[in-house]
């Protein structure tokens, strides 16, 4: 890897994350938590955004990320993990992904 690409990628990811924070609350996000490479400072040129979203929804879990991809139209690779407040409360102590995400993730927005 050539020097500087990781830093440039980090700036691109930060810029896109900032845009998400501006737009997502208007679309129903109650909490936005950055997880993955950017949240732990381990960015490579292949890194994307991983975002844990808390929102009220009746949609099945497997369909929830599509809403965010459709509405935000990310300019970088972005994965959305969407939970309802009740699911987050019920699973935060038992689900390995949530336990790790909540311990290392960076809260970017909360309505509470």
Where are these regions (language model features)?
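Catalytic core of pol beta-like nucleotidyltransferases
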Residues: 1-31, 39-45, 55-112
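Short, conserved active-site loops that position catalytic residues or coordinate cofactors/metal ions
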Residues: 47-49
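Short beta-strand->loop micro-motif that forms the acidic, two-metal-ion catalytic signature
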Residues: 51-53
């Amino acid at each position: 890897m050539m020097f500087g690409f990781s830093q440039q990628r980090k700036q691109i990811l930060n810029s896109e994350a900032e845009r998400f924070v501006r737009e997502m609350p208007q679309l129903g996000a109650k909490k936005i938590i950055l997880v993955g490479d950017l949240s732990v400072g381990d960015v490579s040129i292949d890194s994307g955004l991983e975002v844990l979203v808390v929102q009220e929804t009746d949609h099945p879990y497997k369909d929830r990320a599509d809403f965010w991809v459709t509405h935000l139209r990310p300019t970088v690779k972005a994965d959305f993990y969407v939970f309802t407040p009740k699911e987050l409360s019920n699973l935060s102590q038992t689900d390995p992904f949530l336990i790790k995400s909540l311990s290392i993730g960076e809260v970017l927005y909360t309505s509470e």
